[in-house]
């Protein structure tokens, strides 16, 4: 289990890094729904500067497994040309969702595109993506719930992160 105090500490650390790296700009945060909404809300409250937030929705999971296909359900609806963009994700496993997001953003001429994730599983990565801001690294075999992460829609409301029982 990863407790709420550990999570809070990591969120504050990531927010400080983002604030430092985006000094002098008004960044755009793209929150990937549904999972990242809890992380995004806490992260954004720790960044005391002007910013904009946009929500996108991509889907690649059924139950505990990736389908291997990323579906764009609700896309980018704002102009990010010349802007610093930070994609906020709850968990990065294969990297396919972030690869799709970067492809979507490629034609929008953002000044920079970086990724902030609460959790990554480096051993499961199948793509070459750079995760600039990462809270926790976990084992590939752990399936986790809580703090926005779910199992078939349940568990997002839990304040801590738990490894789901088999």
Could you tell me what each predicted segment is?
Residues 1-166:
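PRPP-associated nucleotide enzymes
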């Amino acid at each position: 289990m990863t407790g709420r105090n550990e999570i809070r500490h990591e969120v504050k650390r990531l927010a400080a890094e983002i604030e430092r790296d985006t000094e002098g700009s008004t960044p755009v945060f793209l929150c990937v729904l549904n999972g990242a909404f809890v992380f995004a809300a806490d992260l954004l409250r720790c960044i005391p500067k002007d910013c904009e937030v946009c929500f996108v929705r991509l889907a690649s999971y059924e139950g505990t497994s990736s389908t291997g296909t990323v579906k764009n359900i609700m896309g980018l609806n704002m102009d990010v040309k010349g802007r610093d963009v930070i994609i906020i994700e709850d968990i990065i496993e294969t990297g396919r969702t972030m690869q799709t997001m970067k492809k979507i953003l490629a034609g929008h001429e953002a000044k920079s595109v970086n990724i902030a994730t609460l959790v990554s599983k480096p051993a499961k990565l199948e793509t070459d993506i750079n995760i600039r801001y990462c809270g926790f690294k976990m084992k590939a075999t752990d399936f986790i719930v809580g703090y926005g992460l779910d199992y078939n829609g349940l568990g997002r409301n839990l304040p801590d992160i738990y490894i789901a029982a088999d």
